[in-house]
Regions:
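Short beta-strand segments
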Residues: 20-54
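Short coil/turn motifs at secondary-structure junctions
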Residues: 43-45, 58, 94
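A generic structural signal for short beta-strands and their flanking turns/coil linkers
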Residues: 21-23, 36, 45-47, 64-68, ...
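Helix-adjacent hinge/juxtasegments
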Residues: 51-66, 71-77
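Charged, amphipathic alpha-helical segments
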Residues: 8-11, 52-53, 59, 105
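Extreme N-terminal tail/first-helix region
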Residues: 1-19, 146
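Short, surface-exposed beta-strand-loop junctions and turns on beta-sheet-rich folds
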Residues: 31, 57-59, 136
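Charged, gly/pro-rich active-site loop segments
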Residues: 2, 73-146
């Protein structure tokens, strides 16, 4: 089996972000990096990853540091293929009433229990991604068992 890896264009990355719903949020914790899964939406008008949060360590770490990384991916373990998109950017609480109303209209369902009254946005500084695809062995690589 051979594989090929290629970089994704920004447009491909944004499309994958828009089509997915769960990713991993990475922030610097007090003593070590902290990575948490979050369900999210991609807000097209602001080109931002948005999610709900409750007051607590993750929320306050985001606002205190004003920076985070966010990763989303898709993997096919049988086909040995997949993709990954990483967003790095500034974090901010969304407080503008018009923006909050627009985000409420995205239909982001809350997965985790508890009240999550705060909207957080990651405004992307960088968006990058990669895709790996695998091809079955064949005559071209000399491994045809036919």
């Amino acid at each position: 089996m051979t594989s090929e890896m290629r970089d994704l264009s920004r447009e491909e990355c944004l499309e994958l972000l828009a089509d997915s719903g769960v990713g991993r949020l990475a922030v610097s914790g007090k003593d070590a990096p902290v990575i948490r899964p979050v369900n999210y939406a991609f807000d097209q008008p602001s080109q931002s990853v948005v999610f709900r949060s409750a007051p607590g360590s993750k929320f306050y770490a985001l606002l205190r540091q004003n920076t985070a990384a966010f990763e989303v991916d898709g993997v096919d373990q049988v086909a040995h293929s997949g993709w990954s998109v990483v967003v790095v950017g500034a974090t901010e609480e969304v407080t503008n009433p018009a923006d909050v109303r627009r985000l409420e209209g995205l239909g982001l369902a809350q997965w985790a229990p508890g009240d999550k009254p705060h909207w957080v946005r990651i405004r992307a500084w960088t968006v990058s991604g990669r895709r790996i695809t695998a091809s079955p062995p064949g005559p071209a690589d000399g491994s045809d068992s036919g």
